[in-house]
Amino acid sequence: MYEKLIQDTVSEVLPKVVEWRRHFHMYPEVSGKEVETSLYIQKELAAMGIPFETGFFQNAVLGVIEGAKPGKTIALRADMDALPVTEQTGLPFASKHEGVMHACGHDSHMAILLGAAAVLSKLKDHIAGQVKLVFQPAEEEAAIGGGRNFVASGKLDDVSEIYGLHVWPELPVGVVGLRPGNLMAASDRFYVHIKGKSTHAAQLHNGTDALVMAAHFIIDVQTLVSRETDPMENVVCTIGLMKAGTRYNVGVEDAYLEGTVRTYTPALRDKMERRLGEILKGLDVMFGTKSELNYVRGHSATINTPEKIRFLQKIGKSYLGEDAVVEPQFPSMCAEDFSSYLQKIPGAFMWLGTGKEGTPALHNASFAIDESILPLGVTMEAAAVLEALGE
């Protein structure tokens, strides 16, 4: 309905979108420290005449565009934080902050949302309702809970639907991935401390070797995936860190392990937490150790509202072309705290393809998007609002 109008307006604001993306890329800030990023967003919103609110949660910014007539409220969301990664892209606008990089594309997400804001601000006479622009800190740090705290602030209580996106190197450039239901996994983290009793390595019968118990635990948890989980379900249980021992000829008194669990369903998530604890208790009895499990729940699974995905699929085919819209066959085991919004508000999360031969993965020090995808993201977000709220 608004194809020509949106396409022309996107073309008009595109140079600014590229400028925004490159600025964000040059000045990344990690979770909870997005101070200058927040101030820059505020400055750009003010320059567009878009009112905004801050101070309700860390460095979050909430912009508001009022349409010409009353109606429902739709939200668009972008995450703001970068990663503690030393950039190796060689880009002329590479990070100027040593050891910090936008290696997950959040620079693009913010630029796209500002671009959608620019388009919608210019076309607000066509809008019957309100648009909330959600600039969210701390997506990468589940302990802070950027999405969870934004929802808890109450600022989105009047929102009837919400949309967001993530650049996705596993899809080709120019393609938008739209999948109903499960899109991304729940991500939990666990910490294990195994307490034994140290002794001379030649007299291990006088002590309790925490390292041997840790080795058994590592092996035993693999059966949670291969022997205790329905093969039609998906789960990942990875132990990525183990620290144990002080010297080659001393039996190990303390062993520490850290790992992650990824699931798609609440029931399987609960089961994994319970079974990790039960395995530890059983091994304590077997080896005489004393163990502690600290299981920390992170982002929940990202589950798209099917109706909203169908809505976006129709928009994508109309605005970008039939071949530009794909439905990914499988969800990802990566996690996203857009899930926090979808637990309360109907909506959908898109994957914006940026993959071509040799494109590094997300979180890689050489990751960089193809900037030709920026207008596609702006178009999808702006069109979602206008098609839902347009007169």
At which residue positions do the language-model features occur?
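Acidic/His- and Gly-rich active-site-bordering loop/insert found
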Residues: Y2-H102, A111-I127
